Amino acid sequence: MVIATDDLEVACPKCERAGEIEGTPCPACSGKGVILTAQGYTLLDFIQKHLNK
């Protein structure tokens, strides 16, 4: 199974991948410039669940 990065995250619509707005971290994406998709959250949850054992 191949998962592309585009399947896991999308560009933040507020800062347009910049991660900041007028020098302050973007509140919508926490300064990352991207927002996880539903599939991204599912993968993150799976990894965290199995690494925290």
From Swiss-Prot:
GO cellular component terms, A-Z: cytoplasm
GO molecular function terms attached to this record: identical protein binding
Domain of life: Bacteria
Repeat region (CXXCXGXG motif), residues: 12-19, 26-33
Keyword Zinc: no
Induction context: By uncharged Trp tRNA, via the T-box transcription antitermination mechanism.
InterPro entries per the UniProt record, alphabetical: Anti-TRAP, HSP_DnaJ_Cys-rich_dom_sf
Subcellular location: Cytoplasm
UniProt xrefs under Gene3D superfamilies: 6.20.20.10
Keywords, in A-Z order: Cytoplasm, Repeat, Transcription, Transcription regulation
Pfam family, one: Anti-TRAP
Task performed by this protein: By forming a complex with tryptophan-activated TRAP, and masking its RNA binding site, it inhibits TRAP's RNA binding ability, thereby abolishing TRAP regulation of gene expression, leading to antitermination and increased trp operon expression. AT acts by competing with messenger RNA for the RNA binding domain of TRAP.
Self-association and partners: Homopentamer or homohexamer.
UniProt-recorded name of the protein: Tryptophan RNA-binding attenuator protein inhibitory protein
